[in-house]
Amino acid sequence: MKIFKEIPTQKPITPILDGINLPSDIRSLSLGELESLANEIREFLLYSVGQSGGHLGGGLGVIELTIILHYIFNTPFDNLVWDVGHQAYPHKILTGRKNKMQTIRKKGGLAPFPSRKESEFDAFGVGHSSTSISAMLGMAIATKESNPEKKHIAVIGDGAMTAGMAFEALSHTGHLKPNVLIILNDNDMSISENVGGLSNYFSRIWASKTYKGIKKSGASFLKPLPQAYHLA
């Protein structure tokens, strides 16, 4: 992964990205080319959003994930729903909008979030957070009979998972068992600290002497098993 110490002020050279206009174009790339594409998108995103303004962190954190989702799934036939709209900048770049990325937040320019009016690849008009699983579930139920082979994917972050709407949708999804995939982007990041009874309850558990003792004992027990010990 290429490391950037500052926002590029000149348009980067992106030979692979220049040839990508739709997700179908990336499905013929080799693994090495996909890795190079990720680096090119990263630099291009820094440059373009650096010109227009916007939220970089969410998009920068899902570049490889965005590439692989569009590589594996047949978008836009398969529905891809992004939970926090700022994560969708790489998605916009790969779905025919890279030449307009500098217009984000400008009059007549691209929306800062996915918009169904903007592209057929935007399956849902995303707001800020916690709506993706509900939206994906509704799509899956609606197409269960007419398009049973259609797949539905939601990408949600650990911060968005603290909302009640996400928990309710998870519960309903587990009951109905539709043809869906939920990806948890657990990056330990959120705009503000978690609040609420559930968060406080688990915080007390994780900070308790009992929990710490159990964790320490479990880690010692698993030490002969390197892979399990790492998880502990």
Locate each region found by the language model.
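Hydrophobic alpha-helical scaffolding
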Residues: 27, 55-58, 128, 159-163, ...
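Generic beta-strand/beta-sheet core signal
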Residues: 83, 153-156, 181-185, 192
